[in-house]
Each structure stands twice: as C-alpha cells, then as structure tokens.
C-alpha cells in the first residue's frame, strides 16, 4: 500500500525472451474515503489520524500485456469517490460533498492511445463550491474537452486551510471551458472561454500593521477558433489600495504570436510597504512609484 491506502493485487509477472509480461488485477479492499485522502500531498502527517472524515470510494483496475521498448501493456484504472468529507479537528469548516469519477484507460499497446475520463468532479470548501469535468481522448493529438466552475470566499477558505501569519479575504468567481486539440508544434489550442472576477480582496501580514485592501480584478480569456492568432486575454480592470494610495489599471493582449497589447496603469505605490506584506528572501526594495501610463504596441 501507499500511506494509508491499501490495495490487493493478484496475477503474475513473467520474463519472456523480450520485455516483461504483465497480467495483474488490483482493487482496494477498504471503501473508506480517508484511505485515498492519505495520497494527497501534505495530508499524510503525524496528525492524519485525528482528521474527521466520511464518504466512500472504490478503486480497481488491471494491467495486461507485454512491456517492451516499443509497446506497453493495456490497462484500465478506475477511481470513484462518493460524498467524501474531511475536517481538521481544530478548524471550524470541512471540505465536503467530494464526488469524483475517473477512468484512465488504454486498450492498445501504444502509450499515445491512453485516454482520461473525468465526467464528475465536485467539492465544497465550506460553502464554496467547485465543479468540473475533463476528457482527454489520447496523447497523440490531445483532443480534449473540459469545464471548471467555482466560487471561493478566501476568508472562509483560510478557516479550512490557514496560512500562518497572513490574513486573507475576498470573493473569487470563475468559469472556464475548453474544447479542441492541443498541438504546441503547430500552435493549435483548444477553443477557450474563461471568465474571472475577484472583488473585496484583502491581504495582511501579521508583521506589518497595514493591509493591502480593495483588491479587485476582472478578466477574460478567449479563443473561439483555437489558435494563437485569435487568443485574447483581457484584464478589463485591476487594482488595489495600500494606506490610502491606489493603483488602477487595465490590460488587453491579443494574438499571442504578434503579442499586441493595450493597457494603462495609474496611481502610486510604496515599494517598501509592498515588500513588508509580500517579503522576498534576500531582497530589499525602497522607493515610491507614481504612474499614469498608457501603452499600446506589439512584441
């Protein structure tokens, strides 16, 4: 097993003249959601046993065939999680309504024919829902389709996953859809439509008395045809306030080959105050930036 995740395996592994021959089936005997939770990076610590949890899971699959320099065994791996929940005992909010359905499959001897199906993925961080789905048909032309939607309240989120010495607040709404083929060589992208809105943002470091406040941003990313040329990233507004000093701006980038941009930034910021909130090791910045900039151009 791995961490607290145990599984049974039966079958054989043989060594013919060429390669390795596999005929293995595996399944998890324990349907407790907490066992698969132990695989999440950072979760399996000394305090893991004290985490409250509920929900069920199933895990099963097989690997069958010859592994050589030019071929792989066929395989089918399935994971399902139903109504999962976990909560740290010292924190007020759980992560619950975790539902996942995932299958990774290859019925051939070629790795490029591997498919990934995630028709269901959803969870609630307290009262903050996230849901989505994803399909990748193969690793050859990377034909894919997916969607991700969510609403996050950062103050509530940090009551589940606290960040020592830092206070956060703000509301994040996002939605994203992608469908099509990805080919980096020929600069082909899936058709993409994504929207992002962040409002009432707040960041405060315990070692500095002032907070970064009124953080806001509205952005969209779009590529209707799935090409670099029609890719548009539009940050229609962004800004923040620090001890009465404001920064406001916008930026639009179109055509990721030509990198045509149009943007503006106006306001003032004290670099020493910013570094106090977001410290960078072995780095010291001082000075005040005052700006009223409009810029248009291409790379």
Descriptions of predicted regions:
Residues 1-60, 86-177, 187, 203-296:
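Interface amphipathic segments
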Residues 70-71, 187-188:
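Short glycine/proline/serine/threonine-rich loop/turn segments at secondary-structure transition edges
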């Amino acid at each position: 097993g791995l961490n607290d995740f145990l599984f049974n395996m039966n079958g054989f592994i043989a060594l013919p003249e060429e390669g390795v021959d596999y005929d293995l089936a595996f399944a998890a005997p324990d349907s407790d959601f907490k066992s698969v939770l132990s695989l999440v990076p950072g979760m399996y610590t000394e305090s893991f046993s004290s985490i409250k949890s509920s929900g069920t899971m199933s895990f099963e699959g097989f690997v069958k065939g010859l592994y050589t320099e030019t071929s792989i065994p066929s395989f089918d791996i399935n994971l399902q999680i139903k109504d999962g929940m976990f909560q740290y005992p010292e924190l007020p909010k759980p992560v619950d309504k975790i539902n996942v359905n995932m299958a990774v499959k290859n019925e051939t001897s070629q790795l490029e024919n591997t498919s990934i199906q995630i028709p269901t993925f959803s969870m609630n961080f307290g009262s903050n829902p996230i849901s989505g789905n994803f399909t990748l048909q193969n690793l050859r032309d990377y034909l894919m389709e997916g969607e991700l939607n969510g609403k996050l309240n950062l103050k509530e989120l940090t009551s589940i996953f606290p960040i020592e010495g830092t206070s956060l607040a703000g509301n994040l709404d996002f939605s994203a859809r992608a469908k099509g083929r990805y080919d980096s060589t020929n600069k082909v992208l899936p058709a993409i439509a994504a929207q992002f809105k962040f409002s009432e943002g707040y960041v405060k470091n315990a070692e500095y008395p002032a907070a970064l406040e009124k953080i806001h941003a509205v952005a969209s990313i779009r590529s209707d045809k799935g090409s670099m040329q029609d890719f548009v990233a539009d940050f229609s507004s962004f800004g923040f306030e620090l001890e009465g000093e404001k920064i406001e701006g916008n930026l639009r980038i179109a055509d990721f080959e030509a990198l045509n941009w149009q943007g503006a930034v106006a306001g003032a910021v004290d670099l020493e105050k910013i570094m106090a909130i977001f410290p960078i090791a072995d780095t010291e910045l001082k000075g005040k930036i005052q700006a009223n900039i409009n810029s248009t151009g291409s790379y």
